[in-house]
Amino acid sequence: MSKKPKVGMWSGLTAVTAVLTAGAIVGTTVAFHYTTTVNNYLDADTYKIIKGDSDEDTEYFKSDFTSDEERESYEAELCAQVEAEGAALLKNDNNALPLASGAKVSLFGHGSVDLMYGGTGSGSVDTSKAPNFKQALEDQGIQVNSTLWDLYSSDDMMKNYSRITPAAISDTLEANTQYAVNEAPWSKLSSAESSFADYGDAAIVVFSRSGGEGADLPSGENGTNDSWIKGQEGDGNYLALSAEEKELLQNLKTLKDNGTFKKIIVLINSSNAIEMDFLNPEICGEDYGIDSAMWIGDVGQTGINGVAQLLAGEATPSGSLVDSYLYDNMANPAMYNFYTQAYPNAADYNLLTDGPDVQGMYSVYQEGIYLDYRYYETRYEDAVMGTGNAGDYNWSTTVAFPFGYGDSYTTFEYSDFNVTESADAFNVTLKVTNTGSTYSGKETVQLYFQSPYTDYDKANGIEKASAELCGFAKTDILAPGASETVNITVDKSELRTYDANNAKTYIVDAGDYYFTVAGSAHEAMNN
């Protein structure tokens, strides 16, 4: 008679132990990845301070503040100042801004009640104590349409027409693809329409977009992807206005034409470059009647106070764009490479599974230095001069607002431009005068240079831009008629170019180098 193997407690324990071991491995991995989140939730102490017997002062970095409250107050004021000096005025027809004292305005767009305060990842912002747009405007004496504000803030609107943004650094690739503008259709505003006339000094529209670390913008092959969500009427282009946003502008234009609203002001609440075709009727084919537009970026914890100061005229815009803004982002060749591509053999090595550490994707970087204004302005020069390989290129129908652009409520004049050379640097001085008659303000002075493009450069494939920013400075607040001498120092190393193919080091070509001050990269090219 054969013996039966003994199965019982030990085999059961083995199975249980195996399951527990697997669970412990998985749990440890997950817990390690979310260490900060878990510790914060459990209110766990992760360090201990042990004081020694020495009398040595170990506080090496002394605070300038006597209390946390004093520090927080300073930070709040600084954030507002950074926003007020960083926002860029894009257009201001008929001096639509600033608003008159005590103006009564209506705020439109879901972004007006749900601002982009910060980005994702390390760029996120604690909004628990952040002022909202209505509060900020009222602090400046501007009256806000409460009926419309309450409608946009209602549970129904917040539930059904809120911006959809993926959680940063999600566990799943799918979660990182869910984007939607999700602007409320005009019909949803009908219950507040009777209040518009009483708050008709201006219709202020806020267009917001999100995107950043761990929550990259929707992209697909050749720059678009119809599977990404854009809104109720999407074509895959998250950085263009949605159908509902265009409908909003169309109806506001009708109300402006019949006298309900005196002016339409648009605020671009995004650190990602939204397409600007809607600001130019000749480009988009429709006149939305927009009087003024301002780029405010992500406003930070208290930066919306700075925006309100600009709208009320308490501050004068002096910011400059740090990107070129296009009518159509597909005019940027880099867009054709900016999409998720998988290595051909990624699946063989299990590199396409969901998770925060997926390593199966790549992007092609083939533009060299020719990104943003270095591309647009270099191709512009080639097109004008008939050099290079510019092809059929029209700068004016491509670039809406160039790198460095930013208007003001006043005007400035430059004079007495002078360049002196030392052993290691060039020193540039010029006089800046506020030539306006009403508003005080600051001026951002931008210094650009152009280096010679030699036969050696061409033979060795050396990349050079037609204009390069090499320095900048901002004046103090200048009253009408006041002047200030600005000084900008440029280290000579800034003029170097990398020779990757022959010398394999930085070189400085012999020839003529030109410096110019300008209000944008494009203005520099035309100086």
Regions found by a protein language model. Name each.
Residues 1-527:
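C-terminal non-catalytic regions of proteins with extracellular/luminal or membrane-system context
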